[in-house]
Amino acid sequence: DRRQRQMCIRDSFNCPMVTSYPEVIYNNMDVVRQSDINFLYPFINLADKPSFKRQMMKALHDYGFTKTEIDNASEKAFAELQHYKQDIRNKGEEVLKWLDEHDERAIVLAGRPYHIDPEINHGIPDMITSLGFAVLTEDSVAHLGHLERDIRVVDQWAYHTRLYESAAQVIKNPRLELIQLNSFGCGLDAVTTDQVQEILQSHEKIYTTLKIDEVSNLGTARIRVRSLKAAVKERDDNDFIPHKIDDYTINRVKFTEEERKKHTII
């Protein structure tokens, strides 16, 4: 559905590391290689329904599933996936309305799906709510953001686009702040930190990032969030209203076919 909603994006790739996780599991866990276990890990593309059905048919054919059964199950699965995404968006809009009605603030805790795992996020969402903020995920508000383009980075990764769109929503909503959860092991995420910071600071919003790999307990994270809360309170006390001070977009210079004949990029 992202392609339909954001046709201006050049492409929409998903993490190449995640696609290889099943093979990593199979090659490193003896339990899944035991003779009485069939470990299936077909490569599937959720953005291409016909391809998805073909791959599932190939993977499940030996188990007695018919094409009709797989087609019906696939249609129901895709419908439920859209319901799930819409539920998240609806909840995000519900929380934003609640913030206005109760004069409260929220933090968009922008992280990858695996950051939802309490073993990975170390309880950061609960800690933030204990300090008086509501917590929103980036995919609960990204659909409300209208990111201006071109931006400095190549916008081709599915999660990165959600991140930039959610930042675009934060800069236009005075009740929202953003904290980015970043894992050192994800090299692709390294480019997002500077870009998100540029988007936020273009409208005088405070950028905060928490490096998950460096957080062994909540002490450091709590200090960072308390500092953010204090900065927000100081701004409120001084009647400071963030506004646009710069553009986060660029005028991208395109390297044309004609220029290839006369120029060399070093």
Regions picked out by a protein language model, each given a short descriptive name:
Residues 6, 40-41, 106-111, 177-183, ...:
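Short glycine-rich or small-residue beta-strand-to-loop segments that form or flank ligand, phosphate
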Residues 10-13, 73-85, 140-161, 218:
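Acidic/glycine-enriched edge-of-secondary-structure segments
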Residues 6, 142-188:
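Glycine-rich, anion-gripping cofactor-binding loops and their flanking helix/strand elements
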Residues 41-49, 133-155, 212-220:
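Short connector loops at secondary-structure junctions
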Residues 10-65, 171, 182-256:
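Peripheral docking tails and interdomain loops at the edges
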Residues 45-144, 254-261:
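A charged, amphipathic alpha-helical module
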Residues 2-9:
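Short, small-residue-biased leader/transition segments that mark boundaries at the very start
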Residues 116-123, 148-157, 192-194:
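Short glycine/threonine-rich loop-to-helix capping motif typified by GTGT followed
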